[in-house]
Regions:
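Active-/binding-site microenvironments in catalytic and ligand-binding cores
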Residues: 1-189
Length: 189
């Protein structure tokens, strides 16, 4: 028996393609943005454990905000009445990927915020960001994971210091290029 989608999946899993893991495990040691209200995060609490007479299995609960750790943002996070993840549906959650690499600029300035000019430089090299794209920001900030202090960029005065997106850049990708989502390696945009 053969199905076209299985064939496509088989091809995608072949040596012709490289799969890159971009996620981190979530647990109570996972770093997250310090502005999240107290009590909003509870990761990996065991609600059923082995030996429970009612249900012989292990079940964990996870409670956390949608913008937690490194994450994906949809237009509604920045654009009032913008699209949320629910808008897209499962069949649309595969997007063309565009990666704006600003690692060199971040190495010079920890507070660097990607600009419209950075995006236009990307487009001059690779072509326009396609409609419905996932636009990711590469800063190499993920190399600070899993240290809460390092990934937060916490200074001696308690301030958080890390790179991110500028609002004009976000408006450009969402309003001018109709991006579906954006991503970044830091705990906040």
């Amino acid at each position: 028996m053969s199905y076209k989608l299985w064939d496509i999946l088989g091809e995608m899993k072949s040596a012709e393609y490289e799969w890159v893991e971009l996620s981190h495990s979530l647990n109570n040691d996972s770093p997250y943005w310090g502005g999240i209200p107290e009590g909003s995060v509870e990761l990996g609490k065991v609600c059923y454990d082995w030996g429970n007479p009612m249900l012989e299995c292990i079940i964990h609960t996870f409670k956390f905000p949608g913008q937690f750790g490194t994450h994906i943002d949809f237009p509604a996070h920045f654009i009032k009445d913008g699209k949320t993840s629910e808008y897209y549906g499962a069949e649309q959650l595969m997007f063309p990927l565009c990666v704006i690499d600003v690692t060199a600029k971040v190495a010079e300035d920890v507070h660097y915020a990607v600009t419209v000019e950075d995006i236009k430089e990307y487009e001059a090299k690779y072509g326009p960001i396609p409609d419905g794209a996932f636009v990711a920001l590469r800063t190499d900030w993920s190399k600070n994971w899993p240290s809460m202090d390092a990934i937060s960029g916490i200074a001696e005065d308690g301030s958080e210091n890390f790179p991110g997106w500028s609002m004009p850049a976000l408006k450009y990708i969402y309003e001018e290029r109709n991006a579906a989502a954006n991503g970044h390696e830091t705990l906040d945009t």
